[in-house]
A protein has these predicted regions:
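Tandem CBS (Cystathionine beta-synthase) repeat/Bateman regulatory domains
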Residues: 1-150
Length: 150
């Protein structure tokens, strides 16, 4: 495992290969229920097989809760983020983390051949980097211990 890993390596190690999504006309209440039930923080919003938006916990808090709106009477299309930042499976993990930091986002839908194939979170990326750094430290410790004339 290397820090130079790609998004595809993260998707390959995720517990589920299923990609959850929603549509614009679904109520926020239903979308939040799905997110809660699947323990995820965002849902790509789909129309005709294409990602047209993303709805996140932050969208819910800022556009429903803090505005006193009803989640049962509000459609996802009314609160979703329309300008979706996406990546391909070959995107570098560190580059994705930098992009998320620069744009203050926590989820990246993964698109391959125009099709949604997954989503990675900032947590997925951080876990991968920490794991890669741990492996590198172990390798260096092994090298130092073998090279030491103790």
């Amino acid at each position: 495992m290397e820090i130079a890993d790609t998004v595809s390596s993260i998707l390959a190690h995720k517990n589920s290969t299923e990609v959850w999504s929603t549509t614009r006309d679904v109520t926020v209440f239903e979308a939040i229920g799905l997110m809660s039930g699947k323990n995820i923080g965002a849902l790509p919003v789909m129309k005709d097989g294409l990602v047209v938006g993303i709805v996140t916990e932050r969208d819910y808090m800022n556009n429903v809760v803090l505005k006193g709106r009803s989640s049962k009477a509000t459609a996802v299309g009314e609160i979703m983020t329309c300008e979706v930042v996406t990546v391909g499976p070959s995107a570098n993990v560190v580059a994705c983390l930098q992009m998320m930091t620069d744009k203050s986002i926590r989820h990246l839908p993964v698109i391959e051949d125009g099709r949604l194939v997954g989503i990675v979170s900032i947590g997925d990326l951080v876990r991968r980097i920490i794991s890669a750094q741990g492996a590198l430290i172990s390798q260096l410790e092994g090298y130092v211990m073998r090279a030491s004339p103790v």
